[in-house]
Amino acid sequence: MPPTATLEDIKAYQQKVEKDKITPYNLPPCPRCSVESEFFKIHAYRERRFLIIIEMLIKAAYCSLVRFRCPGCDKTFTNYPDFAIPHKHYTRPSITGFSARYVESENMTYQQVVMVDNSAVGYPESDSTDAPTLAKTTIRRWITTLSNFTQTCRTAIILLLQENPVSNICRDLARLTVPQRKYKTNQRKKQLIGCRQLVIIEDFFQATFNTSIFTKLATRYSFS
């Protein structure tokens, strides 16, 4: 079963929000007027619904996200916890976990990815065979999203090589391929390889720095 953020993760972040412990320091400078994020001020709080997976069931959990405002031009920014990705209700561990299952397997299909022990991850009312489940098209969209984190991945590689100049990461990334039956266009091929590269970079980054590229790095580069 791919990992998921837990209720405890979300509750812990909510407590940080309530205690004013969320700062803008890991946000990028304002792209409009170049003011550094350390000068940003709290603008608003926005409730966000997250979908987590508990014992094969998809359940909702709620948490407040903090929006900061640039004092130079009034542009606003959302500070995301490391279990969140912009515009996605499912948590980052679920998104990366299910996506990795597909791109790292030569034979896995999208339909097989959403199945665990011959059962599909579904919603609490799934006593009916017609009840909604995690859709295979959702996995496809997640892979597309993760393939777009090019700046984050590029910077992560630089940091990894600075820490360990003899790292095998560049060699490992260069020889990545995907089965031809998994794509029909060169664009999709690039997206699949890009997602697979992110999965490998994340593993290297976790092993080297004991933290995720999503904790600060992805936020710093505006999830690009």
Where does each model-flagged region fall?
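Short, amphipathic alpha-helical "recognition" segments used to contact nucleic acids or chromatin
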Residues: 91-107
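Short, basic interhelical loop/turn and adjoining N-cap
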Residues: 106-141
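Short helix/strand-bridging catalytic loops that position acidic/His residues to coordinate divalent metals
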Residues: 82-87, 97
